[in-house]
């Protein structure tokens, strides 16, 4: 829970139950709903995202409606609470990480083929 608290305080959009009053539930984060092998990838995304959100003064308006794995790739659905258009460099950043995710093993985070969910080592162990 302390790790979740740290992450949510640094990246509030990781809180799956964030409301417009910024009331946080520190019991889990969006990271908990995603493949564990993508953790470093998502944290890298969040670090770069925070820089851009700070640049545009959008940290308090930024939300993630859903983050999931689909067809071996990250899908990150975000929006701004005031209904304004997302800055293009934020859109581009999210797309970059969605693309990168298809080459990261969902179990261990190693490099993998884009046509399989896991690297060769994890496939041998788990499948």
Predicted regions and their residues:
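Short cysteine-rich clusters marking metal-coordination/redox-active sites
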Residues: 105-108, 119
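Long, charged N-terminal interaction/targeting segments
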Residues: 1-91
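A domain-level signal for the structural core that forms small-molecule/cofactor-binding pockets
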Residues: 90-93, 110
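Residue-level marker of regulatory loop/turn positions in helix-turn-helix DNA-binding domains and
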Residues: 97
């Amino acid at each position: 829970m302390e790790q979740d608290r740290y992450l949510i305080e640094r990246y509030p959009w990781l809180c799956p139950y964030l409301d417009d009053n910024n009331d946080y539930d520190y019991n889990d984060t969006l990271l908990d709903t995603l493949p564990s092998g993508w953790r470093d990838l998502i944290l890298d995304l969040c670090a770069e995202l925070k820089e851009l959100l700070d640049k545009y003064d959008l940290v308090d308006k930024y939300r993630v409606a859903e983050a999931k794995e689909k067809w071996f790739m990250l899908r990150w659905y975000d929006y701004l609470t005031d209904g304004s258009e997302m800055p293009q460099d934020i859109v581009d950043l999210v797309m970059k990480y969605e693309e990168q995710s298809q080459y990261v093993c969902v179990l261990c985070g190693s490099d993998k083929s884009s046509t399989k969910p896991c690297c060769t080592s994890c496939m041998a162990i788990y499948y």
